[in-house]
Amino acid sequence: MYSHFKIHIGNELPNTINNYNNNNNSQHNDKMNLSKIKNNQDIPTSNTNISPKPISQQKRRKVEKGGVECKPIVPSTSSTSTLIPTPPPKLPQQQQELQHHSKPSSSSSSSSSSLSSSSTSIPNSPTPIFPVFLIPTQNMDLTCSYSNSQNYVESNINNNINNNINNNNNNNANNIQYINSNTYSGGCISRSSSSSSSSSSSSSGKSNENSIHLNSINNDNNNYYNKVLCYLNQLEDDQRKQYLFQQTQPPQPYPQQIQPPQEQLQQHQSQAPHSPLPQPQPPSQLQTQSIFQISPIPQNNSTQQILIQQTQIHITSTPNQTPISTPQQLGNQQFQFYQASKSTIIEKNNINIQINKNNNSGEFSTNSETNISSSNENINSNNNTKIDNNSNTSNGFNSNSNNNNNNNNNNNSNSVQLNYIEYDGINLNNQIFMNSDFNNEFFPNNTDENYPSDHNSNDNNNDKNNNTNNNIIINDDNNNNPNNNNINNNNSIEIIDEQKHQLQLQELQLQQEQQQEQQQEQLQQCHIEIIKNNSQFPFTPNTTESGFSSTSTTPSSTSVPSSLSNSSSAIPPPSSNYLDCSEPINNLESFNYNNSNTNTNNINNNNNNNNNNNNNNNNNNNNNNNNNNNNIENINIKNSNSNINSGYKSNINCSSPNRTVPNSPISNYSSMSSSSSPNSFTSSTSSLNISCSPNSDPLTPIVPTTPTLIEQTFQIQQPSFENIKNNTQISPSSHDGDTISEVIINHINNNSINNNNNNDKNNDIDNSNENLTTTTTTTTTTTTTTTTNNNKKKINNYKINNYNNNIDNNNHELNDDDNDDDDDDDVDDNDDNNNNNKSIYKKKEIKKREIRDELERKNEPKRRELIKKFIESKDSKFKKLTTDELLIMSPKVFGKISRYNMFEVFFGNEEVCGGNIKVSDTIKYRDQLEQILKKVWSTNEYWRCPLCEDIIISQKSFSQPHENRFSNKSCLKYHLLRLHFADVKSTIVKKRKIESRDMSSDPRYRKCKHDDCHSWITSKHMCDHIIIDHHIDDPQKSKTCGKCNELKKKLKKDFFNNINHYYESNKLSDLKIEYNNNHNNNINTNNNNNNNNNNNNNNNNNNNNNNNNNNNNNNNNNNNNNINNNNTNNNFKTIITTTTTSTTTPSNNIDDDNNKNNNNNNNNNNNNNNNNTNPIPNLPMPKNLQK
């Protein structure tokens, strides 16, 4: 079994390589290369001669279409473990002409837009070096298939303008640019020091192959190096590892020789006894010919500070005299990284990175300020913390970025390059490699739903930096201050002079003091009135001793949560208790951005494809920020898709950030409303109206009342497994519509109880979006905890506990959940002045809890009796219940929590789950079940059985990888069938008359031909209809049923005929399709032939892999651009894609703008656009077309 590595030339994504395979020139070139290799025409005649086996004895393997088949070559006994084979001798003139004929023109040889401009060989080097550097990994899997590289470069000529780079980097012709791999094992990762923006960072996103990008191979040596790589390809795993790098042995002047297998030696001697095998150069030559140019290190010891989100990294460097030229000199054993588990986050670290160039080692150590807290939040959950100056657009739209590479490389030679790779810190070229994910070595199974296994969130989004290279975030000690982050639109970070910066800070502090005085005067007469835009938050809070109340409709005064102010910021807000909506939020860190880098990639993706629009957006952001009173300059919102000032209307209202899906940023600050289901954890925005009241007390602290303002500060509580397992009674919370109390209230006209319950419901703080203790599926709870546990940072945050809003008999205050830990009940204020208040508050809460629990224990028997009375009695009898009895029932109606694991339902036994359930029973008794379900009170989190009052929750397990695979409603059906089967059977249901609707005009529907069946069905529901409605007792009969088979055939044929008729009637004859078995092949072939017309394909792949709120807009817009192409089959495929990707959460306003720009720019880049204005039907397609 051979190990392989895949080689690509150019800067396109690997999954688009085959798009060029149908080009005649590429096939011609590949045939020429294949013939030259087979005929051994241009194999050098020096010591590196390679004598291949006869073709008949070669172990053949499949080669990609248009590729070159690699020949197995036996290694010599004298081969050494060096990386660089000797350069080829000068070839005969005829062979050079042949090679030149098969090459692209000189403009194409300028290679991809991501030439590593500083990765040059030593000027005195006799010939360019071919560095084949592979970082040693375990279980290395290197895939080699040389896939028509000439045409691959040739096809990228129009997209890459690299003349300036090519002129300044003549020695870079043989440089290899390594890229990120998807998995730790087999990762071939490296980068050149201070390398320019690289497109290869996005190359491994879609597939799991480990691919290497060659940035323009020298014309004279191209085929020679192909043979070298083919030679490496034929080695066994251990031999190649020993050949490429001496992993297990210490560095030696001449490493030990490899002993090839005796069997291969005999074959070699019998076939070509006089032809020596290639002998790579000894390591001594490696030390004289530096593969990577080493960036000059400052001659004085300098400590610089780098801001990576909330992590401070100090880099101390010493003068270096010894270049790092080989990976053997700097093995992975010399780097001591902090190895974090998956449940650990490094918060506000000060990490000292010492790079001692004399012994070529680096150490990571954490000082006393390091604060590591255990939580379920990972700053790297989506591998989104990548700061990579190597990335560029794979389509090569930005010629400016390529031209700027020279300037950046010349001017920034002293900068420290910070790259994120997926290996644990091998330093090949004087760079600091820091793993943004603590990656696969620490948790190799990247199967977590929050962590895409293919790293598309970083690698496929044409990452961050377009126009700059080698710039890094160098900040002062106040790294939390957003005013000091000169973050440009292209993520180039300026190095700030320390002394200058101190002067600026002093000036800013003076300005801040003046502003603070002015704003305090304004706020003396103002308070913030919370007005909800959506009934989803129907509470009107007021403060009490515990911070919450249940009666008031308008707060006497409000304040901004302390999370909106940061005492460590250089420019704190004017007051820690107030928010002036005429000013923007000063501190970006007041909101949690740790999980918001995914959409940053979306911004950069749009910017990469919209270079012109990019500049406009940048100017807009700068203008908005320069107009602020706080003098925040050049701040582009790094972790949000919106302009932070876009939603502020002076002194009128200011909207709070949307509460978005976990692992996405607070994506919009504009005053917009978005309707979404509570399960998606997206709420509509709340507007803050500034109203002046001379009687309001501005000094009264108010607990934050709108959860959207402090979205990060919620502590979502997850139910305890022991409680579930032991059937511990857990509160379902006071969703009044979910409890029996509402049932009683609906039948009894008791104003006092109505008021209490209404107030209780009004004070339910975002229960529609919070994960209540008993009402969440495991998936949602896990991801939300990931979002919220971020907020344990030492900032002034209020921590809102998961209150159940239960009405107490004595004081109608909110009480927290039964199963909350005591540590979660206090307010998380970091101020030293609040320590005493925290302890007092904690003691009070503990006392309240004890009193409440004792009361509930006493009332439990009576409550059970009342519930039984409620179930068995009629409505008229409830008038006999007293108010006290109703109050005992209303706040908490317990009942056993039935968490249904569908695996146990279907495959369990009687001891575990009471016996198996037939799936057909849900169909046979569906009318009876629906009749019973009419009496059910339900929420989005759970349903309640009307017969036994059990709380029914669908439990996620290994058999349920998807959140909504089994709903709570379906679990309740199984509950009724298992525990209340007699009641289900005895339920009398009136038969419904099936109303037949004429659907003949709709091409998607077909009428069923079965006897007495008048259903109109689609191909999507055809199988379900046939099996359930006609062959439920014996599903196998549907295969032999003539009417079923006739229906299947007609559905497919009529489906296509009706669609064609629809297109013709709407003058869309270009979209007419034929129904045949080769339809998929036609689509794929035409896509390959028209790849130049589909510049958005890469973007579709990128955006589809970013599981964010805002990706739907990107996908649909890109697909709409593809619809405008001339290709008929491609248009049809685009319709399918649009259909399958049209069900995500609504996008935000700023995304709409960006995507409009994206559409405009991409349409300009498409060569053949048809501006069709006719509507394209959004129709579901058969499964065979959706592949």
UniProtKB/Swiss-Prot annotation:
It comes from Dictyostelium discoideum. It comes from the Eukaryota. Residues 815-832 have a biased composition (Acidic residues). Residues 71-84, 104-124, 190-215, 248-274, 458-490, 543-570, 585-653, 662-689, 752-790, 797-809, 1079-1149, 1156-1174 have a biased composition (Low complexity). Residues 38-127, 189-215, 248-287, 358-415, 443-490, 536-689, 752-840, 1079-1187 are annotated as: Disordered. The lineage of its organism: Eukaryota, Amoebozoa, Evosea, Eumycetozoa, Dictyostelia. Residues 38-57, 443-455 have a biased composition (Polar residues). This is Putative uncharacterized protein DDB_G0291812.
